Every structure is written in structure tokens, then in C-alpha cells.
């Protein structure tokens, strides 16, 4: 995957989970990308199943503080039918697409 990202020469968006160890995994992923010349523009936190709201809020703040990369969205667990099209539309409702593109394009 690293070679692919380097070949397409586009910035990355890291999708991190919100569970135990998520801060460490987000930091390691962002640092790995940086070491390989891949710019990470944003983090999206997904899979917040069974995460205490206070801990989730502090995890998001810590991810931003330790990586210096903004968290653009926190997507809560999906609770509907298991249909990809429905899930995608549902997830989009939590992501500010204008903010996402402005961040990726550096606007």
C-alpha cells in the first residue's frame, strides 16, 4: 500500500478506530506515512463501538495533539440494515465533504 500511495502522489486520510489503543495506532500510522514521504491531511475516527463518550472526545483531542493532523469526523457505529449503499450514505452524513476536500486540496 505504501508504494501505491507514493505512486499516485496524493495526500492520505487515515481512518482510525475509537477503541483502546487508537491513539497509538493513529500516531504510528501517521509517522509511518511521513517516514515514507506520504502526506496525511486528515484523520477520520470510525468504529466507536462501546467507547465512553468522554474517552472518545479525549482520544480525538489527543490524536490531533500528538499528530498535528486534524480529525475531520467521528463516525458512530452504524445501526441499520447491512446494505453498503445505505451505510455509505449514512457515513456521509457525519462528514463535512466541503471541509474534507478543502483539507485535502489545501484550500
Across the structure, where does each feature detected by a protein language model lie?
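Active-site glycine- and acidic-residue-rich loops that bind
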Residues: 20-22, 52
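Inter-motif core of Ras-like GTPase G domains
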Residues: 1-19
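C-terminal lobe/tail of nucleotide-utilizing enzymes
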Residues: 31-107
Amino acid at each position: 500500500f505504501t508504494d501505491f500511495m507514493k505512486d499516485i502522489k496524493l495526500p492520505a486520510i487515515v481512518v482510525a478506530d475509537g477503541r483502546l489503543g487508537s491513539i497509538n495506532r493513529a500516531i504510528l500510522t501517521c509517522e509511518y506515512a511521513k517516514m515514507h514521504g506520504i502526506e496525511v491531511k486528515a484523520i477520520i475516527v470510525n468504529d466507536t463501538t462501546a467507547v465512553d463518550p468522554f474517552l472518545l472526545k479525549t482520544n480525538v483531542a489527543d490524536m490531533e495533539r500528538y499528530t498535528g493532523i486534524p480529525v475531520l469526523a467521528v463516525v458512530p457505529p452504524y445501526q441499520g440494515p447491512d446494505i453498503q449503499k445505505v451505510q455509505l450514505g449514512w457515513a456521509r452524513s457525519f462528514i463535512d465533504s466541503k471541509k474534507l476536500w478543502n483539507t485535502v486540496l489545501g484550500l
